[in-house]
Regions:
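Conserved ABC ATPase "signature" region
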Residues: 119-137
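Q-loop/switch helix immediately C-terminal to the Walker
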Residues: 91, 99-112
Length: 272
């Protein structure tokens, strides 16, 4: 699915500028990966790379290699990969097509441009809107939606494409914690049924801790750690947002002798 081996990208002519990497990532079909880091960590740059936007990055491969869904990491453009890779970003209104006058047409826009038969387009639209709880919005204009409604519709647009890789780049920023949990449970169901791999890019450990099997920590473009939750928690950069109680606990406990099970994290995040 995804294999990045020592991959480092940046500017060959300006080696002192921001670099991303070296990155070592292995993601299998159906797996969920959380990429955690603060502002400026390189999360969105990595998201664009994974989505297939290499040609828009204007960067160079400085070291290593990468394969994403069987393709070299530096091949093609975003639109060439849209049928199998979907990237949902933080600002939903910027992701609307701008040429549809209803939510139903917006969700149908992508599948229709794949040249699918009308019955298949309609099935995908119906399934995706039901999954994202936005059937009641079908006749609304996309630009009349609230922030939370718009994010659910953009997620429906992505799922209607039936992707093999779904990249969620702070895609729940306008949803409440409860609504975020609901949406992620729905996406988990889709992932289990389709084999779609999911990557969450977040500043917060919540909600990724509840849904992801693997975690990658980024700080100023550097990969600090990658592995299961208990393996990466001791390496969390200060700019990853935690509750004060959890951060204090991580500072005093010895990770070699005290594992951090998900039950412990759920207790800390019960306040959310």
């Amino acid at each position: 699915m995804i294999s990045l081996q020592g991959l480092t990208i940046g500017h060959t002519a300006h080696p002192d500028h921001f670099q991303l990497g070296p990155l070592d990532i292995e993601l299998k079909e159906g797996e969920w990966l959380a990429i955690l880091g603060g502002n400026g960590a390189g999360k969105s740059l990595l998201a664009q790379l994974l989505a297939g936007g290499w040609s828009q990055l204007h960067l160079d491969t400085l070291a290593g290699e990468g394969v994403i869904l069987g393709q070299p990491h530096d091949s093609g453009q975003l639109n060439h990969h849209a049928a199998v890779r979907q990237w949902v970003q933080q600002s939903p209104y910027l992701q609307f097509s701008g040429c549809c006058f209803s939510v139903a047409d917006e969700v149908a826009f992508g599948p229709a441009n794949l040249g699918l038969l009308p019955d298949e387009v309609n099935r995908r639209v119906s399934d995706a809107m039901a999954l994202c709880h936005c059937k009641a919005l079908a006749a609304r204009h996309p630009l009349d939606l609230s922030g939370g409604e718009a994010q659910r519709v953009v997620l429906a647009c992505a799922l209607a494409m039936a992707p093999k890789l779904l990249i969620l780049d702070q895609a729940f920023s306008r949803l409440t914690p409860a609504a975020t949990q609901t949406m992620l449970r729905q996406i988990r169901r889709y992932s289990e049924e389709s084999g779609c791999s999911v990557i969450l890019l977040e500043q917060r450990l919540f909600p990724a801790a509840h849904f992801c099997e693997r975690f990658l920590l980024l700080d100023h473009g550097r990969q600090l750690a990658c592995g299961e939750l208990g393996e990466v928690l001791p390496h969390l950069p200060g700019r990853v947002i935690l509750t004060d109680s959890l951060r204090e606990t991580l500072q005093v406990r010895d990770p070699r002798h005290h594992p951090y099970p998900l039950a412990m994290l759920r207790e800390f995040y019960a306040e959310l």
